[in-house]
Amino acid sequence: MKRLITLCLLGACFLSAPAQNYVSQVWVADQGNGTYKNPVLYADYSDPDVCRVGDDYYLTSSSFNCLPGLQILHSKDLVNWTIIGAAVRYALPPVTDVRPEHGNRVWAPSIRHHNGEFYIFWGDPDQGVFMVKAKDPKGPWS
């Protein structure tokens, strides 16, 4: 019996050895030479919308029923993006039923900049059209 346990342990050690050498790769679109490869954003940013303010670009996309919602991303070159905040911290309108509503809530947003303020508009198929605004794209949004 001891011999069987020893063999099993040795086998487990040999099987796990290759996994210790594996290092996962992070997707990088920027090739470092002025070019890029698609996809620029290796994630699910459905219905993206971008606005330019000076030399800066701001992106938001559908977040559906996920919170915090309407992630705000920033870029200087449309290739390298960083998440800088979220425009929706709680369900709009407030809900008492917390079951997931896939395909509902926040989708197809539009981000704009006008007179020193950022605006995001989006439609909810059941509730209507909503808007949040902020002076700084990092927030706070109201």
Name each region found by the language model:
Residues 10-18:
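Hydrophobic h-region of N-terminal signal peptides that target proteins for export
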